[in-house]
Amino acid sequence: MSSSYSPERWSSDRDLRFGQVIQIAEEAIPNLKQYEISYLGSGWCNDVYSINNNWILRFPRREEVITHLQKEVSISSVLVPALEETGVLVPDVKLTTPSPSVGFPYPIGIYPMIKGVSAGIDPVEMNWTDFIPKTANFLRILHSIPVDQFKDFHLPTQETLGCLEGFIEMKEDILSHLHSYEVKSLDVCVEWLDSCEPLPPFSGDLSFIHNDLAPEHILVDPEFGTITGVIDWEDGAIGDPVSDFVTLPFWIGWENTFRICDSYSLPMDDKFLCRLEYGSKFLSLAYLYDEAQRSNDLSSQISFIENVWELDLSLLK
């Protein structure tokens, strides 16, 4: 999630019937004698299905989404080999075009399913002694990939925190939303947000970044409690490495986030932690506002604020 809510962004300009999903699955993966197709959910851009818990199919919700899938195909051609040594998998996305007889208008994304459950959402007993160094190593190698390897992909360059794009301008709306709860525990959040100023552009070396490393995009092994994969790279950009740390405190807290920073082993400028704190605080409040525009279930977003701000917001649950 890299920008604020609008109904149009969640809309779909085509129909998708389950019969079409079956036809496309049979075309995309021939010789499927027996199979089970499961609907996994829908996001900004795609309706997502799995086949036998072995393959992922992503169906664009709008024509404009095709360019996002094409971007992921290009990015994955660099990421898959570069990150193989980390033991953290990334989707090896390919595009396939359904035959005209199926009646689905767009190409779809397909890739081998990465095992694991979404971090911070499904309750998992974490193995921090494995998760922390493995995640730090993943981020270190990711941010060490030479940016010229992405030069032909026309990625955006961001000298400010891209995760806050669209939210900075909505500061007054976010403040009004926080006031609406009339919960004293949120006063510290309101006071900080009311007085904070936008960060100056980052002047250091830019890296390739995931740029939306929210908990749902990190997969963890439910049995062993460690990271298995990172998905949804459509917001990938050349930017400030801090961007990929901002959402870690949402679900692992500050102590474990700082332990990842300590194990990261790439040079950090003297404002790294300041930008990390600013981004985490602002984005946690923005996520609450954003989700409230379309859902009454704000339990995850409230939990994020509790972890980032170290508050008890049980009155909101």
Question: Where are the language model's segments positioned?
Answer:
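An alpha-helical support segment within catalytic cores of ATP-dependent transferases
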Residues: R14-K33, P98-V102, G109, E125, ...
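Short glycine/proline-enriched coil/turn segments at helix->beta-strand junctions
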Residues: K33, I51-W55, F250-G253, L266
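Helix-rich C-terminal or lid/interface subdomains of diverse kinases
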Residues: S42, T129-P133, D235-P241, V246-K317
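Short beta-strand segments
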Residues: R58-P60, K94-L95, H154, F208-N211, ...
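Active-site acidic catalytic loop and adjacent metal/ATP-binding pocket
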Residues: W44-I51, L57, D194-S243
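Short, surface-exposed alpha-helical segments at coil->helix boundaries
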Residues: F18-I22, V73, W254, F258
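A short, highly charged nucleic-acid-interacting micro-segment common to nuclease
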Residues: S6-L16
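ATP-binding pocket architecture of kinase catalytic cores
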Residues: R9-S11, Q34-E165, H179
